[in-house]
Amino acid sequence: MTRPVLFGLGDLAERLEGLVGAEPGTDGAPSPVDTAMAYVHVGQLFASAEPRVVTTILGSCVSVCLWDPQAGVGGLNHFLLPQAVENGISSARFGNVAIRHLLDEIAGLGGQAARLKAKVFGGASVIDAFQSPQNTLGMQNVALARSVLNDAGIPVVAEDVGGAQGRKLVFQTRDGSAWVRKI
């Protein structure tokens, strides 16, 4: 059994293994039954070759979900800022770093870049209410995600970005499905 990769949580990664979710509700969310769950905070990422339900809450932050349908490997990140301005910074709080780290982790679990599918979520204007909708921090994060994925040749097959509301994201590594609720 391969061990899921969870960055930034220390021993919490071990405590998350083996958790079983509750019965699915009537709101259309993916069923977490018999699947371990993980929550990804800002500046973290998660990748697994095992079935996992991964959740996060997004405002102006962005999550890129990647999935290799043939290998059954998937994961997501949660980044705060588009890119590091200083050389040598490798924090997953920055989109350019977080996406590269996620690509590396998925490759390490058997995923291949040529087969990856991407989904992009977040980028709301929850703080930038008085800026132009195209120039908010959230939309800068979205633009960076699209650019890095495009440069890597990874198609974005779904997205829910922008707007003025945050989002709760639920992603399943087993089949690449995602569920989003505006909050």
Question: Where on the chain are the PLM-derived regions?
Answer:
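Active-site microenvironment for binding and transforming phosphate-containing groups
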Residues: 1-183
